[in-house]
Amino acid sequence: MNDILIKLEQVLEQRKSAKVDESYISSLYNKGTDEILKKIAEESAEVIMAAKDGVNDKIIYEVADLWFHTLVLLRFKEIKVNQITNELSRRFGLSGLQEKAKRNN
């Protein structure tokens, strides 16, 4: 799974230098954080609607869109995929209550 995320990360990085009128991603970068966040909110709502519909293929499709636009945000903010996977690894094996208690200290 990590391989496709790394490949996407590389493409998203390349799109930073693409012409705005030739790249959807470049146009999002050009519009800034608020526009990227609007797309993430839109995709999140679509995941919720797909889940309520109960059709797994729709859920998969919409989650892929959500992950993609989240990756756009990460690249825009100069956050690498491995930083997220490292954080997930750090949390692995901790109960949710343990992880929350660590944040409150």
Curated annotation (Swiss-Prot):
Keyword Endoplasmic reticulum: no
UniProt-annotated location(s): Cytoplasm
Gene Ontology CC annotation, any one: cytoplasm
Keywords: Amino-acid biosynthesis, ATP-binding, Cytoplasm, Histidine biosynthesis, Hydrolase, Nucleotide-binding
GO MF assignments: ATP binding; phosphoribosyl-ATP diphosphatase activity
EC number: 3.6.1.31
Known catalytic reactions: 1-(5-phospho-beta-D-ribosyl)-ATP + H2O = 1-(5-phospho-beta-D-ribosyl)-5'-AMP + diphosphate + H(+)
Signal peptide: none
Family: Belongs to the PRA-PH family.
Name this polypeptide is given: Phosphoribosyl-ATP pyrophosphatase
Name of the gene: hisE
